[in-house]
C-alpha cells in the first residue's frame, strides 16, 4: 500500500512539472510570435519611440524602489544607492491585432520577455545626469525583466547600483541637513518626443506592487550610520543641454537627510570639553609650580590642535567656517588663554616666597606702602648707618609680597571667570546651531 502511494505521488509531481514546462513553452512561443509579427510590421520597433510616427511624445512612467543607501560621503560630495528602476509605457506596435487574439485564446493576462526578446524591442534611453559611476547587476543572471500586459502596456524593471553627485552645504556641520537628488532624464529625445512622469499607482496591480501608492519607496531596512532619511519627494526638473537641442524631460527624487548628532557628541564635543576643563587645573596649582603648569598648558594646547586637525581631515577644504570649526577654535582659544594666564601670573610672582601672608591678603590688596609706612622722617629714623641696607631689603620684600598677592588674585579670578565664560559659550553655541536651518 505504501509503495502504491509513493508511486502515485511521484506521478503527480511529474505531471505537474511537465504541465508547468508546457505552459512556459507555450508562453515563450506566443511572445516570440508577437515580437516577430511586430518586427515584420514595424521596421523601427527597436530604434524609435512608440508614438514617433504620430508626432506625439511617448509617456514613460517611473517608479523607484530604493533598496539601500550605502554611504553619504562629505569629502567627495556624493552618495551611493541601490535601486530597482521601474519604467512603464504603452507600445501599441507590439500589441497588434494578432497579439490581441493570442492573448484572448491563451487567456493570459501578461507575458514575460526573456533576455533575447528584450533586446528586440524599444526601451527608453534613460540616464542619470548626476551619476559618477554605476553598474547593472548580473550575478547568476541579468537582474532585469520586461512584462507585456493586455493593451500593450510594458513594465520594465532593472536593478542598479550608482554613486551620484550630492553638493553639500557644510556651514552647519555637524548640525546640517542635506538634500541629495537622483536625476532621471532621456539622453537622446527632447520633451517633444519623450516625456517622463512619476508613476500614478491606481490599479489593483499597481497597488499590489506598491501598497503605499507612492512613486518612490525606501526599503524599511535602510539605515544610515550618520544620517536619518526624513523624507523622499518626487519632483520635476526640465533641463536644456544646448540651445538647439530643446528641453529634455527630467524628473528627480529628493532625499532629505538629517545628520545624527550622537556620534559627534561622543567623539568630538565631550572630549574637547574635557580638554578645556583639564586646562583649568593649572589655576589650582601653586604659583611656584612652573614645570607642572607649563606642561599642562602645552599638553592641552597640542591636544586641541591635534583633535581639530583630525576632525577636518575627513572633510573637504571649503572656503567658509563650519560649526565644528567655531567650536574647535573657541576651545583652542580657551586652553591657550589658560596658558597665557599662567605667563601673566608667573611675571607677577617670579620672586621668592609668600611666607607671612594669610588668605585675607588675597582678597584685600595691599595699600600704598607710602601710606602704610607714613612719611619717612629722618628725625624719627634712629637706625645706625650700617642698618640702612637692611631697611631697603625689608622695603623690597614688601613689594615682592605685593606682586605675589596680585598673582594669587589673578589665579582665583580665573577659577571663576573661565568656567562661566565657557558655559555661556556652550549655551550660545548649541542654541544657535541646533535651531539653525
Which ranges hold each PLM region?
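Non-transmembrane, solvent-exposed beta-strand/loop segments in proteins
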Residues: 2, 15-295, 310-327, 347-412, ...
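Single-pass alpha-helical transmembrane segments
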Residues: 6, 273-278, 328-343, 412-431
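Small-residue-enriched core segments of transmembrane alpha-helices in multipass membrane transport
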Residues: 295-307, 329-331
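Classical eukaryotic N-terminal signal peptides for Sec-dependent ER targeting/secretion
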Residues: 1-11
